[in-house]
Amino acid sequence: MVATCLQVVGFVTSFVGWIGIIVTTSTNDWVVTCGYTIPTCRKLDELGSKGLWADCVMATGLYHCKPLVDILILPGYVQACRALMIAASVLGLPAILLLLTVLPCIRMGHEPGVAKYRRAQLAGVMLVLVALCAMVATIWFPVCAHRETTIVSFGYSLYAGWIGAVLCLVGGCVIVCCAGDAQAFGENRFYYSSGSSSPTHAKSAHV
């Protein structure tokens, strides 16, 4: 029973974390920047936000983004963080699907428990890799961006990435280390026996 609960907890935690990583990858509010001194920016109410795909300017009644489409002039850290976040988002999909197939409520024929166990271990390792890719990108990006401009604060995209990476790491570790062995995966099956058929009563007809 404990192993079953841990499997479900690992799946839910990993799924929520993967969604957070996708949100981080697709949005541009990674860091809030200031082109002048911080007091000047606050006085002018003019701040910027920087992400993987665009640089945005936020002013009173104005929000304008400039897409970062010229790969040749992009800083190396932006391209590397893009690759890491895309890899994390793509790798998370098969990991989540593998975890879905090893849940106790899912049964694929009469497969042995060791098959589910191996899929669970593979999915857990993949989720740990997803978490590591996201962690490296979400830590590396603000450090390098701070060298180019003044960072006022971190954006919601970065927080979503940190939370998502931690959740994927926790979920992957739970699946790999705590969700039971091959025997536990074999025992977590639910069988439903159909009720006994009602006896048929034959009626004899007298002519």
Swiss-Prot record:
It is a multi-pass membrane protein. Residues 1, 104-122, 179-207 are cytoplasmic. Gene3D superfamilies: 1.20.140.150. The modification Phosphoserine is found at residues 193-194, 197-198. It is found in: Cell junction, Tight junction; Cell membrane. It comes from the Eukaryota. InterPro entries: Claudin (IPR006187), Claudin11 (IPR003555), Claudin_CS (IPR017974), PMP22/EMP/MP20/Claudin (IPR004031). The keyword Cell membrane applies. Residues 23-82, 144-157 are extracellular. GO terms for cellular component: bicellular tight junction; plasma membrane. The chain crosses the membrane at residues 2-22, 83-103, 123-143, 158-178. Keywords: Cell junction, Cell membrane, Membrane, Phosphoprotein, Tight junction, Transmembrane, Transmembrane helix. One of its GO terms (biological process) is cell adhesion. Its main location: other. Pfam families: PMP22_Claudin. GO terms for molecular function: structural molecule activity. Interacts with tetraspanin-3/TSPAN3. Interacts with OCLN. Plays a major role in tight junction-specific obliteration of the intercellular space, through calcium-independent cell-adhesion activity. Belongs to the claudin family. PANTHER family: CLAUDIN. This is Claudin-11. It comes from Bos taurus. The gene is CLDN11.
